[in-house]
Amino acid sequence: IHGTPGEDGKLQGYLDMLGIPYSTCGVTASALTMNKFICNNYIKNFGIKVAASICLNRASKYDIENIAKQLGFPMFVKPNTGGSSFATTKVKSINQLQDAIELSFKETQDVIIESIIEGIEVTCGCYKVKNKEVTLPLTEVVTTNEFFDYSAKYEGQVEEITPARIPEDVTER
């Protein structure tokens, strides 16, 4: 089940209460990873570099000029707890920022605004079987769109290259 309640820990918690096994990650991992801002702050504790970000909720008072000054352009504005790059905007100037924030607020109660990290986009699946962790090969994500947006993900405007074309030492990390 895509999104809430399938990816945010709610369904997993319900299944745990009923003693029904399932094949996704558990409640904690699901809840943590569905909230981008909290997840990014958590993984920073392990030395993982993440984009600088600001999280706003509907009650937040914010200053567009201050956000622009803090994060610079371009930046991404997206629902903090959404997925699929839905209502995500790559903002290139201060003139686009307010509209991008409002678009994301139409989908969720909180919005994350992130600086951009330039580079190669990769994804990696992993799973656990009988207490053994298995990591799949890295896949490089290449799109002709400006970023890996909803249409790239769901309308086939993407090329996925496995293994990713990155140095072996980077893959090992």
Model-assigned labels for residue ranges:
Residues 92-170:
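Phosphate-binding site of ATP-dependent enzymes
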Residues 25-27, 87, 168-169:
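Short, contiguous strand/loop micro-motifs
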Residues 24-25, 84-85, 159-162:
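Short small-residue beta-strand/loop micro-motif enriched in glycine and branched aliphatics
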Residues 1-54:
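Conserved N-proximal alpha/beta basic substrate-recognition cap immediately N-terminal to
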Residues 47, 168-173:
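ATP-dependent carboxylate activation and anion-phosphoryl transfer catalytic cores
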Residues 32-120:
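Active-site nucleotide/adenylate-binding loops and adjacent lid/helix of ATP-dependent enzymes
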Residues 7-11, 86-87, 123:
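Short glycine-/acidic-enriched loop or helix-start segments at secondary-structure transitions
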